[in-house]
Amino acid sequence: MLKTEKLKLVSEWDKTFPQSEKVDHKKVTFVNRYGITLAADLYKPKNASGKYPAIAVSGPFGAVKEQCSGLYAQTMAERGYLTIAFDPSFTGESGGYPRFMASPDINTEDFMAAVDFLSVREDVDPDKIGIIGICGWGGMALNAAALDTRIKATVASTMYDMTRVNANGYFDSEDREEARYAKKQSLNTLRTEEYRKGEYSRGGGCVPLPVPEDAPFFVKDYSEYYKGRCYHKRSLNSNDGWNSIGCMSFMNQPILKYSNEIRSAVLIVHGEKAHSYYFGKDAYENMIKNSKYTSNKELLTIPGAVHTDLYDNPDVIPFDKIQKFFKENGVG
């Protein structure tokens, strides 16, 4: 039996969305191959029996399972799936030290560890497992799909490519060697300072407060979600953010390099008006470029939708389409 960390899990319902009367819910844990114990919420249809198709959900990058990944998981459970929404390593209720770090390798492994966990459950059909990655975890989901042949279908919703945005800045505005070098210099200077002090500083959260009047719309959009209607005390984006050096390894470890070798089905869902739309469009184009596996790949553009509409707006998130996609591709 794999050794697990002892986690402190909250017993009461503390999600940012109402609890459904149509599903059963409980907390579970599982361990990844780095020995980090992950905390998850498991949802399944009430009065369930037999083996179910299963879906693992995570994201956004810096969020917790009590926010929109849990909403996705609970909604898909209402539609007949056994689902889990998990906190990534180093965040939320999951284990891993130091806290508030991110890693393209470990975070991809988190998804694969979720598949491990689901595959051996007696109430799951191991041949019918899919994943959903939201925002920055959309890119991680594609990377997991490129590596894990057990994943039958993948949905990337309102996705980011975290390696691209860390290396190039928003809208590729820093896509120059000198800009990247300056960023590396700054981060490595900070590494030395913080190692000397023996503690890590925090990056300051997803958005500043108060939000400047001239801030871009997407910054205000994030603020309304993370600081407003879906604030959660364990969410990095709702509070003090990642460690200041927590995401630096994303700068030179591109996670989508082999996406055109994904043989299983992929649905990328993005809002037409989202500031992040270019991530989804480009990820789709790169996935089908010079690929032999294009027939089961799809980009779904939601007219008029902005980035966080696909976080928690039930009138915008295309759950009917997502359910149909999974069923048509072996997860249902």
Predicted regions, residues:
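N-terminal cap/lid segment of alpha/beta-hydrolase-fold proteins
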Residues: 4-50, 311
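Short beta-strand element of the alpha/beta-hydrolase
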Residues: 51-60
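The serine-hydrolase catalytic nucleophile loop
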Residues: 62-74, 88, 280
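Conserved alpha/beta-hydrolase
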Residues: 75-95
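Alpha/beta-hydrolase active-site loop
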Residues: 101-122
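Alpha/beta-hydrolase-fold enzymes
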Residues: 142-228
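Short beta-strand/loop motif that positions the catalytic acidic residue
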Residues: 262, 268-270
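Catalytic histidine-centered segment of alpha/beta-hydrolase-like enzymes
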Residues: 305-315
